[in-house]
A protein has these predicted regions:
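Short, contiguous acidic and Ser/Thr-rich linear segments
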Residues: 19-30
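Short, structured protein-protein interaction patches enriched in aromatics and acidic/basic residues
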Residues: 52-61
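Ferredoxin-type iron-sulfur electron-transfer modules in oxidoreductases and energy-metabolism complexes
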Residues: 29-43, 86-231
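Short strand-turn-strand beta-turns centered on an Asx-Gly dipeptide
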Residues: 24, 63-67
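A generic structural motif
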Residues: 75-76
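Eukaryote-biased recognition of intrinsically disordered, low-complexity regulatory segments
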Residues: 1-21
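Active-site phosphate-binding and catalytic loops of NTP-dependent enzymes
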Residues: 43-49
Length: 231
């Protein structure tokens, strides 16, 4: 297969460029990350992130033939012979396929991604019924790969103001958690023209999520909570 890979080293390159690599790979059970590792063996100057190789850590997210995804779970057999790889859009490029995730994680941390409960700690865990626990399905599985937020035009335009699909999915994860006591505080923080309401239900986030999650649905639930509180 042939990989056209975005290359950019700010220490020596005046501007980015694309470079082609030929890789011989048995496509039967191989993933795109395997091809990238082979490219790295040919040219050790190329840079990309990787870790778990199992679609759990989210570190090898990149733009694959114009669509964000994880290289480690993208089957070579499902790809054309010519594959174009670029860094995730909308974030500053550090080098080659590595982007600066600072703004993404700044927005994530801004929603206070942890249970806030001021009751005295129980002897064991804070209890939930099976039904209450099921409300978190489709929310907690997010691996923070940033595929969704970097596919969102609203995040491209206002990354410093709009929380983004990933952050808002996690915001609703804690709003939906019956153990959390900070509902009013969380809604006050999100009731803003930019932080929440820059979402225009374009739904690119749903299309690219490698875990099959639905950030748009979670965002709409937050909007519903704000409307119910207002009336």
């Amino acid at each position: 297969m042939r990989l056209s890979i975005y290359r950019y080293d700010p220490d020596k390159d005046a501007k980015p460029y694309m470079k082609d690599y030929e890789v011989a790979l048995d496509s039967h059970d191989r993933m795109l990350l395997d091809a990238l590792v082979k490219v790295k063996a040919q040219d050790d100057s190329i840079s990309f992130r990787r870790s778990c190789r199992e679609g759990v850590c989210g570190s090898d997210a990149m733009n694959i033939n114009g669509r964000n995804g994880l290289a480690c779970i993208m089957k070579v057999a499902d790809l054309p012979e010519h594959v174009t790889l670029r860094p995730l859009p909308g974030l500053p490029v550090i080098r080659d396929l590595i982007v600066d995730m600072t703004q993404f994680f700044k927005q994530y941390h801004s929603i206070k991604p942890y249970v806030i409960n001021n009751d005295p700690p129980p002897e064991r865990e804070r209890m939930q019924s099976p039904e209450e626990r099921e409300e978190l399905d489709g929310l907690y599985e997010c691996i923070l790969c940033a595929c969704c937020s970097t596919a969102c035009p609203s995040f491209w335009w206002n990354p410093d103001k709009f929380v983004g699909p990933a952050g808002l999915l996690q915001a609703y994860r804690f709003l939906a958690d019956t153990r959390d006591q900070a509902t009013a505080e969380r809604l006050d923080d999100l009731n803003d023209p930019y932080r929440l309401f820059r979402c225009h239900t374009i739904m690119n986030c749903v299309d690219v999520c490698p875990k099959g999650l639905n950030p748009t649905k979670a965002i709409n639930h937050i909007k519903e909570l704000l409307v119910k509180r207002a009336v």
